[in-house]
Amino acid sequence: MPVPPISELNLRTEAFIGGSFVPAADGRTFDAVSPRDGAVLAQVARCGAEDVDRAVKAARRAFERADWALADPAQRGRVLKRLARLMRAKLERLAWVEALDTGHPIANARAVDVINSANCFAWYGEAIDKVYGEIAPTAADALALIDREPLGVVGAVVPWNYPLIITAWKLAPALAAGNAVVLKPAEQSPLSALVLAELATEAGLPEGILNVVPGYGEEAGEPLGRHPDVDKIAFTGSVPIGRRFLSYAGESNGKAVSLELGGKSPQVVLADAADLQAAAESIAWGIFYNAGQTCHAGSRVVVEQAVADELKERTIAAARTFVPADPADDDTIFGALISAEHRDSVDGHLQRARQDGAQFLYDGGAGDDGGAAEPVPGGAYMSPVVIDSSDDPARAIVREEVFGPVLTVQVARDLDHALELANATSYGLAAAVWTRDVSKAGRIARRLRAGTVWVNSFDISSMTTPFGGSRDSGHGRDRSLHALHSYSQLKTTWIAL
């Protein structure tokens, strides 16, 4: 399918503050560059501290106005469900904006990014009027009500790898709970958040309840994190920046902070795995989907020695089907990395691995691409890589998050060794185990240090299940009622009878 002209996408490029699109206070802009071909899609408002302050003040006024915070929860739900319907109605526009801004294959942008984001708003729209308070046990002369109320102003800072989905994960529960939000999208992929602000207004969200301040982290993200009138920061991104937000909170008003900071997720394949072909295909999808730019990507395989050679052979064959191709082609399954700079960062990890003596089992080359087009000149493309690091589990390529299409394999002597290798990381986001013994799988899942453990599968999820981790993967959860509760606080009302 041909790429639609940019003019037909009706891009929004200004900040969204207090219900209106406005330029940055100082008039500055930055280029939104497509990783597909390096083309400049638009000049976007480059917000700074003054713009963030305007947005926070607009959010606070809207929250105190209380037409959203104290509205019937069912009314808030109707607005969120209306937004979900608008997103589905504007599927092509949103999908193309996301594909061109991130390098996601257009088929994935349609079927995953837009649909899952719309479903997230619809889910919280349905859930919000089904959350009940409590009555505490008291003597007969008192009534103690325990209820939840919104926090106030939430600052949401989202990354570039899944900008629409992760924005929905933050916005939907925060808005459902009755908060006002200031959203700072990543400077590498700001466009879908601005379109979403337009659709939210059309859906009936009151002015000031959602504000969007595109810009660079140190110019817009830090002022948001330090602002004394922000009640919570919800951040997804890197470990170093997440730690900064903890510092910003401590140095300002002690605001709540939830962090999702990435991972180095292991897939543990045991000798009794029922279907090595299914495991190999799932492993390939688990790391090479979105060119490996997924926080919980299954970037490490730990396999028992008895089946190691066969699994490596099957996994390499599966990797060959992921050939870099034009994200605008409907047949593409493996698009671009977010930028040439990020591609160079991934390549730096690979160069270091070569210097460290790692064995490269597969490093691109010809494969069956299913008829997808060739990569576009000027784009940020990279082939899949499979590395065996069984001889040195301490290599940086095994321990550090690469955030690219790079899979490492380690061979384990037995189950205990496999668990030792799987847990030899500072992260704790996700893991998988492949075995035909469900009882064994249950025992292993308890020993894997991860917020989510899949058994005989990978990256299967639902809005009903929480997502998040521990240690360097952060704390707090997206999705599910657990996320909804994290955007509210408990209040006790004691009534003397």
What label would you give each PLM region?
Residues 1-37, 62:
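Hydrophobic face of amphipathic alpha-helices that form TPR/SEL1-like repeat modules
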